[in-house]
Amino acid sequence: MTEQPTKPTGSRPPRQPRTGLTSTGARKAGSKSDRSRAREFALQALYQSLVGKNTVSDIDAFTRDLAGFSKADSLHFDTLLQGCTEQAAALDALLLPLLDRKFAEISPIEHSIMWIGAFELQHCLDVPWRVVLNECVELAKEFGGTDGHKYVNAVLNSLAPSLRAAEVNADRGKTRA
C-alpha cells in the first residue's frame, strides 16, 4: 500500500461547513427564502417611497423589473408594499412611542425595515414573531447603518408583546423554564 502524500501545513485552511452565511454573518443570496427576497425588494420599494416620493404603482413596476425579482414571493412583496404604504401613518403611530428620536433622524432604511416588521407582526400572523424580528435584523445588517440592526431589534422587540402578546409570552415562558 502506498501512503498518501501529506500536504505541507499551512498550505490551505481546513474546509468549513457550508452554513449559508457569509464571513460577515449575512446570508448568501442562494440560501435566502422566497419571502426573505420579497422583504428585500419591499425594503427597496419602501425606501424609494420614503426618499423619492414616487407613486406606489411606479415603484412596483420598477421593482418587478429588477434582477432576481422572479425568485421572490411576489404575493408577500405585494402585501408588504401595499400594506406598509397604505398604513404608513398607523405603523408610525405604533413605532413612535418606542423611539428615542424623531423619524426625521432615523435612516430611511431603518424606518422602512421597522415598517416591514410592524406590518408583519400586526398582519402576517402565519410568520412567527421571532422570524419577523430575525428577518428585520438581517435586513438591517445587510442594508442599514453600522449599528442599525441593534436599534431595529430593540424597537421591534419592544413592539412585539403589544401585537402578539400570547405568542411572545408563550415563547418567552419556554426559554425561562
UniProtKB/Swiss-Prot annotation:
InterPro entries reported for this sequence: NusB-like_sf, NusB_fam, NusB_RsmB_TIM44
Extent of the signal sequence: none
Disordered: annotated span: 1-36
Superkingdom per UniProt: Bacteria
Pfam family for this entry, one: NusB
GO molecular function: RNA binding
Entry's Gene Ontology BP terms: DNA-templated transcription termination; transcription antitermination
An example Gene Ontology CC term for this record: cytosol
Keywords linked to the UniProt accession: RNA-binding, Transcription, Transcription antitermination, Transcription regulation
Family: Belongs to the NusB family.
Function: Involved in transcription antitermination. Required for transcription of ribosomal RNA (rRNA) genes. Binds specifically to the boxA antiterminator sequence of the ribosomal RNA (rrn) operons.
Protein name: Transcription antitermination protein NusB
Naturally occurring in which organism (per UniProt): Albidiferax ferrireducens (strain ATCC BAA-621 / DSM 15236 / T118) (Rhodoferax ferrireducens)
Gene responsible for this protein: nusB
